[in-house]
């Protein structure tokens, strides 16, 4: 089979040879037959990830309430804070979730955390279309999935994480999760800014589809 951009299965992209190797259920195996070769994270490490970051401070408007933020609410927040997202921007969503984890001082309360802080509504088709139309280059949050997980209930098919499907599979937009954004968000708001230089190289892991990043904001 030929994937998007003309990459070929079994050559540039190798899937698992056994379902147990997919890592979707249970423990992830120590070894894997999966490799993305041409699309490995090492390519991002070699070129680095650097450009204009744009902070959207959801926490400033919503606090730590568990809310699935759809298109309408996101647009109101952008308008109120005079935030403009342009083509090529790396968009960061500050929800306060990572800050909550740190405040629990290595004793996280799972029940509290699973009912805390905002996340994007991946089922909102207008929100997904905005991601496409805006031309943003990366979507990053300080929560564990960027979008609400489990996703908002709906009728019909299909994706468990629809925003992941839209960004990663359809558009090739990388996602960042569990970044500690609160100190930066507080500084930007106190200086009436939303933009900064973001440098966020991943680790050079040949064939891997993801990696921890080492992000630095220059203000």
Model region roles, listed by residue range:
Residues 1-219:
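Active-/binding-site microenvironments in catalytic and ligand-binding cores
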């Amino acid at each position: 089979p030929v994937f998007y951009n003309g990459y070929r299965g079994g050559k540039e992209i190798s899937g698992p040879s056994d379902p147990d190797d997919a890592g979707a259920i249970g423990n992830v195996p120590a070894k894997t037959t999966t490799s993305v070769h041409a699309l490995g994270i090492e390519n991002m490490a070699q070129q680095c990830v650097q450009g204009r970051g744009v902070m959207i401070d959801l926490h400033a408007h919503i606090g730590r309430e568990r809310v699935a933020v759809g298109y309408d609410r996101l647009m109101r927040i952008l308008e109120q804070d005079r935030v403009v997202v342009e083509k090529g921007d790396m968009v960061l969503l500050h929800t306060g979730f990572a800050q909550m984890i740190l405040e629990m001082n290595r004793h996280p309360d799972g029940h509290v955390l699973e009912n805390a802080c905002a996340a994007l509504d991946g089922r909102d088709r207008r929100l997904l279309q905005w991601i496409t139309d805006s031309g943003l280059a990366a979507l990053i949050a300080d929560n564990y999935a960027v979008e609400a997980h489990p996703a908002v209930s709906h009728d019909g098919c299909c994706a468990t994480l629809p925003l992941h499907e839209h960004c990663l599979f359809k558009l090739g937009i990388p996602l960042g999760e569990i970044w500690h954004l609160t100190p930066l968000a507080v500084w930007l708001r106190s200086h009436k800014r939303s933009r900064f230089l973001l440098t966020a190289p991943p680790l050079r892991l040949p064939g891997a589809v993801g990696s921890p990043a080492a992000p630095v904001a220059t203000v």
